[in-house]
Amino acid sequence: MSFRINPLNAIDFYKADHRRQYPEGTEYVYANFTPRSSRLANMLHDFDDKIVFFGLQGFIQHFLIETWNEGFFNQDKATVVSHYKRRMDTSLGEGAVSVEHIEALHDLGYLPLKIKALPEGSRVNMRVPVLTVINTQAEFFWLTNYIETVLSAELWKSSTTATIAFEYKRLLTQYAVKTGASIENVVVQGHDFSSRGMSGIYDAAQSGVGHLTSFIGTDAVTAIDYAEQYYAASGVVGVSVPATEHSVMCMGSEENELETFRRLICELYPSGIVSIVSDTWDFWRVLSEFSVKLKQDILNRTPNALGLAKVVFRPDSGDPVKIICGDPDAEKDTPAYKGAVQLLWEIFGGTYTAQGYKVLHERVGLIYGDSITLQRAEAILQGLEAQGFASSNLVFGIGSYTYNYMTRDTFGFAVKATWGQVNGVGRELFKDPVTDSGTKKSAQGLLRVERSQDGFTLFDRQSKQQENQGELHTVFENGQLCLKSTLDEIRQRLAQQLESFKDSN
């Protein structure tokens, strides 16, 4: 029997009995999910302090609908209730948590919750809620914050990944504009290499779609599946190319490495793009010696249906900036001193952009996916520009150091209740710890979010009529997904917001 998540148990234990801890007569609890601070985020120096909101629709469909239906509502009531009681009894103590409210929820047959949210793909200012949630039936007031644990766990990562992916795209777009490179090429310049370093394959899928909001280059196969299933993705969702790994090169043996390259280039992949890991033994020898011997084979490869016939060399170790742009401390005029891009230029030549920056011959290219961060990517692009090369000469492999070296605290995401109703009377709730720096101070009361010149602005302490206005729209209500966005629509929203960065340096 395979392991399945019981949605009732997707909580922290302390949530189980909060129902009794609320004041007698509690009827409604209203909470929000908000990025509070970028203090711990390792972003670029000119980061504008906005996150990309993404991931809610997938969470709603996968967890709030599918998992709850399959794991609770569609199961025999006596069975699921007894399982829940056993879990509570064995960990919290016999009879510590009653089950009548769980039985009532099963009888109801759906989650009596309403979630309002900003459009996915919005870039949202810090301390502005991206969503609110409230129970729709007074009997189930406890349910709003019962789902806090899973809502937070499932949403912070997708938004954080999408935010970082957008930052890579912003950086690449700015350098494409500066050096006259093709803007259309940027969507393949960030390639997702992160799957093997993520927290499980589901995490790789879910996070990987965050990458796909800004790029189409990916090796995360499951991310495309997730995008198709939960975001109606169609057309070009994600693309990759044939590529080798070190085991392939090692099996070919060091003494036959040149022949391994030749076989890959001429026999296995005589057309299209092929990426070959090139530092299994001596990267500089591959570029300065092997590529010269294989030059005519490389130039004679046949373009595929897309007109592509490129051999991509992949270094996978060392200092990325020095490998690509050259090491000024190396012996002068050696391959290490010149760097990979300059070496390929000397061997294969190329063309120039309208701004006068060099573009490698269309038959060769580079991809670097080891130890890439936003800061290293920026340093490489600066180095290429200084050497007179366009930014399009390199593809960045973005790995788990970027997409998994983060936490919920990267952007301070938190779920907080700000309003409730007890015996028919509303109560404005807020926290403001005297021992805190101000980051944990919450909004207060019912909330409204409006568009502003700088993104979005929060208005708290709103009336019910005011709360119904603004940019937060109902996306989930009483077990149903009410409003859908496709991946294409999300990409378009982000692309529109990218326009303002094209003229900035």
Curated annotation (Swiss-Prot):
A GO molecular function held by the record: nicotinamide phosphoribosyltransferase activity
Triggers of expression: Repressed by the ADP-ribose-responsive repressor NrtR.
Residues given in the record as diphosphate binding sites: 196, 246, 314
Traits of the deletion mutant: The nadB-nadV double mutant can grow only in a minimal medium supplemented with niacin (nicotinamide or nicotinic acid).
GO biological process entries: NAD biosynthetic process
Keyword set, alphabetical order: Glycosyltransferase, Pyridine nucleotide biosynthesis, Transferase
This protein's pathway: Cofactor biosynthesis; NAD(+) biosynthesis; nicotinamide D-ribonucleotide from 5-phospho-alpha-D-ribose 1-diphosphate and nicotinamide: step 1/1
Primary enzyme class: transferase
Activity regulation (record text): 10-fold more active in the presence of saturating ATP.
Reactions listed under catalytic activity: beta-nicotinamide D-ribonucleotide + diphosphate = 5-phospho-alpha-D-ribose 1-diphosphate + nicotinamide + H(+)
Signal peptide: none
EC code: 2.4.2.12
SUPFAM superfamilies: Nicotinate/Quinolinate PRTase C-terminal domain-like
Annotated residues for binding of beta-nicotinamide D-ribonucleotide: 219, 314-316, 369-370, 408
Other remarks in the entry: The nondeamidating route is likely involved in recycling of endogenous nicotinamide (the product of intracellular NAD degradation).
Record-stated family: Belongs to the NAPRTase family.
PANTHER family per record: NICOTINAMIDE PHOSPHORIBOSYLTRANSFERASE
Function description: Catalyzes the condensation of nicotinamide with 5-phosphoribosyl-1-pyrophosphate to yield nicotinamide mononucleotide, an intermediate in the biosynthesis of NAD. Functions in the nondeamidating salvage pathway for production of NAD from nicotinamide. Displays a strict preference for nicotinamide over nicotinate substrate.
Name the UniProt record assigns to this protein: Nicotinamide phosphoribosyltransferase
Organism: Acinetobacter baylyi (strain ATCC 33305 / BD413 / ADP1)
